[in-house]
Amino acid sequence: MAEPVTILGAGLAGCEAAWQLANRGIPVTLWEMKPDKMTPAHHSPLLGELVCSNSLRSDQLENAVGLLKEELRRLNSLILRCADTHRVAAGGALAVDRMAFSQAITEAIQGHPNITLRSGEVKALPEEGQVIVATGPLTADDLAQDIARRFPAGVYLHFYDAAAPLVTFESIDMDSAWFASRYDKGTADYINCPLTQEEYLAFWRELCAAKEAPVHGFEDKNVFEGCMPVEVMARR
């Protein structure tokens, strides 16, 4: 019988790892601290929760991101299967219905005979057995400290991110806005809202002066240049 594997964290990486191992006949125990322990960034008890954007980036084979997705599909990826099933219109990108996507992942994991899902916080790395750590940037403090203790010479990376804002369709004046594709790729799934120079400058000034959401205790504002909050971009 194959040696069991313990996986810590049931986000995208943890769920995919559990799925791939389980499909190969390897027993998996998958630990997830939600819903027993939530963080300020979590809003759902479901597995595979998207805490930022609902876009999984490009789905075009002409670039590396899209090519990796196609390779994952051919490897029976759970994440890509659920994303394709619950995708929403986004031109050349792969975007999903957040809740339906996570619900599908949760049901697949819960229904797999080789996966045992455990709810609760793991405060230290298991001392025995094969273990995959997939707790991501929202790792609980005790486990993060245990990892740091075991790897004292490690370099700990982080960056400040923000949840993508949601705008209701009813709030947009479609007499002025129009649908178009993004970068002239795919279908016309994006709403374009035009501004005159005067309107743009007024918007920019208001954005720079706008009140910000309070920073959580575990965050600092070391932003990632490739995924920058719009207010930080405006102030530059």
What does each of the following model-derived ranges do?
Residues W19-R81:
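N-terminal FAD cofactor-binding segment of flavoenzymes
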Residues G14-E16, D141:
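Short glycine/serine/threonine-rich phosphate/pyrophosphate-binding segments
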Residues D59-A64, R87-A104, T135-D142, I191-E198:
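Short beta-strand to alpha-helix junction loop
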Residues P4, P27, Y156:
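Residues at the starts of beta-strands that form the adenosine-phosphate
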Residues A64, K69, G91-L125:
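A structured beta-alpha segment of the ubiquitous adenosine-cofactor-binding alpha/beta core
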Residues A2-A13:
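Beta1/beta-strand and adjacent pyrophosphate-binding region of the FAD-binding site
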Residues L61-V65, K69, S77-G92, F151-D161, ...:
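A short alpha-helix-loop-beta-strand transition element characteristic
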Residues A108-R236:
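Predominantly flavin-linked oxidoreductase catalytic cores and closely associated redox partners
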